[in-house]
Amino acid sequence: MTRSFPDRLPTNLAFPGISVINQSSFVDLLRRQAPELLPVSLGGGQSGGGQQLSHGTTIVVLKYPGGVVIAGDRRSTQGNMIAGRDVRKVYITDDYTATGIAGIAAVAVEFARLYAVELEHYEKLEGVPLTFAGKVNRLAIMVRSNLTAAMQGLLALPLLAGYDIHAPDPQSAGRIVSFDAAGGWNIEEEGYQSVGSGSIFAKSSIKKLYSQVSDADSALRVAIEALYDAADDDSATGGPDLVRGIYPTAVTIGAEGAAEVTESRIAELAREIIESRSRAYTLGSFGGSEK
C-alpha cells in the first residue's frame, strides 16, 4: 500500500527524486521555462536601481457592510518632477479581487497584470478558482520574489482587496490584505488601510471619516476624500484635477463581484468634496478676520 504525503512536493515518476514543475503557477512555470519573459523585478534580468524611474502613490482601501472599495490617485513622480498625471494603479485581478500597488510604476503595473494571469492560469488548469487564502499566498510569493530588486530600489508594495465567497457572514466578507517587502502579509481588521507616500495622511483622514461608512457609495466618498487630503499634504499624490478631467480610479467588490466605478460618479463626488471644502475654507477665513 502506498501512502500519500500531502506536504511533500510531487516528483517525476520517470526520474525519482526530481520535483516536477508546479504548472498551476504561471509565474513558476515562466520562471523555469522562459525566465527572460518575466519582469526584471521577478528575475527576468538585471537592474541598476530605481532612482530615475517613476513612482506611483497613493492607494486606499475601505471595508463596508457587504464588500470593500479600493481607490488610487493618478500621479506618478520622478524625483521632484511629475512624470505622469493619469497613471492607473488599481486593477481588477479576478471576479472577486482587485489590487492597488504603490512604488515603482513599471513594476507595479507588471505585478498587477502578472497576478491577474496567475489567478486565471490556476483556474483554467485546476477547474476551480483559488480560495481567498490561496490568492493571498500567491501574491505573497510574488512580492517575496521581488525582494532582491526591492533592495536595489525597485520596490512595489500591493494592497489586496477582495470578497471572500466562503465567509460565513456575507456582510463581513470584505477583505483587506497588506504586504511588506519580504512577502509577509497581514489581514487588516480595522476596516481600512493605505499604502504609498501619502498613506499617513490618507489613513488620518479615513480614521476621522470612517464612522460615516454605511454602504458602497459612502465608502467610495470617504476613499476619494482621503485621497484629496493626502494630495493636500503629499506632493507625490495627485488630487482630483477638474481642469484636465483626471480623477482617481476605484473598484468596488461585493457578493456580485468586482466592478469599476464610473469616472462620472467619481467626478461627481470629487466636485462635491471640493465645493464643501471651499465653503469651509471661505467661512473659516471670514470667521478668522472678525474680532
From Swiss-Prot:
CDD domains: proteasome_protease_HslV. It catalyses: Cleavage of peptide bonds with very broad specificity. The formation of the proteasomal ATPase ARC-20S proteasome complex, likely via the docking of the C-termini of ARC into the intersubunit pockets in the alpha-rings, may trigger opening of the gate for substrate entry. Interconversion between the open-gate and close-gate conformations leads to a dynamic regulation of the 20S proteasome proteolysis activity. Residues 1-56 form a propeptide. Keywords: Autocatalytic cleavage, Cytoplasm, Hydrolase, Protease, Proteasome, Threonine protease, Zymogen. It comes from the Bacteria. It is found in: Cytoplasm. The active site is at 57 (nucleophile). One of its GO terms (cellular component) is cytoplasm. Its EC number is 3.4.25.1. Pathway: Protein degradation; proteasomal Pup-dependent pathway. Its main location: cytoplasm. It holds the Pfam family Proteasome. GO terms for molecular function: threonine-type endopeptidase activity. PROSITE patterns: PROTEASOME_BETA_2 (PS51476). InterPro entries: Ntn_hydrolases_N (IPR029055), Proteasome_sua/b (IPR001353), Proteasome_suB-type (IPR023333), PSB_actinobac (IPR022483). GO terms for biological process: modification-dependent protein catabolic process; proteasomal protein catabolic process. The 20S proteasome core is composed of 14 alpha and 14 beta subunits that assemble into four stacked heptameric rings, resulting in a barrel-shaped structure. The two inner rings, each composed of seven catalytic beta subunits, are sandwiched by two outer rings, each composed of seven alpha subunits. The catalytic chamber with the active sites is on the inside of the barrel. Has a gated structure, the ends of the cylinder being occluded by the N-termini of the alpha-subunits. Is capped by the proteasome-associated ATPase, ARC. Belongs to the peptidase T1B family. Component of the proteasome core, a large protease complex with broad specificity involved in protein degradation. This is Proteasome subunit beta. It comes from Mycobacterium leprae (strain TN). The gene is prcB.
